[in-house]
């Protein structure tokens, strides 16, 4: 018996890509943005097909992402930001609501929303995940977006 497998690829399908970026912790977030753009361009997306939309912070990213998804102009949306744990429960609220909100937008509009919002315990962890020891999570989110666009196109064609 031969099993059929359907998988996405990283070859950029035609389309536009939106980066919704939270400005808080910009010293980390800008590395995520650079990583995402680099990954998209290396996989065939033209810079003219990439739009960066800046939100104040991670908590605001889901609403901005929803408005972008409503427009129907983008093949995928890549959410980028950084929430760093402090001494209050603020971290849990912001990280949780951002995560839930982005998942809701993706399901509601059928548009891939790649999650590149760091939720970390320390500045050191944020730096590691934005281009040093642990790779660049912005680039990883961009690759996830490309793969999802490809996968959904295959599923819709069947």
From Swiss-Prot:
Its EC number is 2.5.1.78. One of its GO terms (biological process) is riboflavin biosynthetic process. InterPro entries: LS, LS/RS, LS/RS_sf. NCBIfam families: lumazine-synth, PRK00061.1-4. The gene is ribH. Forms an icosahedral capsid composed of 60 subunits, arranged as a dodecamer of pentamers. GO terms for cellular component: cytosol; riboflavin synthase complex. Gene3D superfamilies: Lumazine/riboflavin synthase. It catalyses: (2S)-2-hydroxy-3-oxobutyl phosphate + 5-amino-6-(D-ribitylamino)uracil = 6,7-dimethyl-8-(1-D-ribityl)lumazine + phosphate + 2 H2O + H(+). Pathway: Cofactor biosynthesis; riboflavin biosynthesis; riboflavin from 2-hydroxy-3-oxobutyl phosphate and 5-amino-6-(D-ribitylamino)uracil: step 1/2. Keywords: Riboflavin biosynthesis, Transferase. This is 6,7-dimethyl-8-ribityllumazine synthase.
């Amino acid at each position: 018996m031969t099993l059929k497998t359907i998988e996405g690829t990283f070859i950029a399908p035609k389309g536009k890509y939106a980066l919704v970026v939270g400005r808080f912790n910009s010293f980390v977030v800008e590395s995520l943005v650079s990583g995402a753009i680099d990954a998209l361009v290396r996989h065939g997306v033209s810079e003219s097909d990439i739009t960066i939309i800046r939100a104040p912070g991670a908590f605001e990213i889901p609403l901005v992402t929803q408005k972008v998804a409503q427009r129907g102009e983008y093949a995928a949306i890549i959410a980028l930001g950084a929430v760093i744990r402090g001494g209050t429960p603020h971290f849990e609220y912001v990280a949780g609501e951002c995560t839930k909100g982005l998942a809701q937008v993706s399901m509601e509009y059928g548009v891939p929303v790649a999650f590149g919002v760091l939720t970390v315990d320390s500045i050191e962890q944020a730096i590691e995940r934005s281009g040093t020891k642990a790779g660049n999570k912005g680039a990883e989110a961009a690759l996830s977006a490309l793969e999802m666009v490809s996968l959904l196109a295959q599923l819709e064609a069947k």
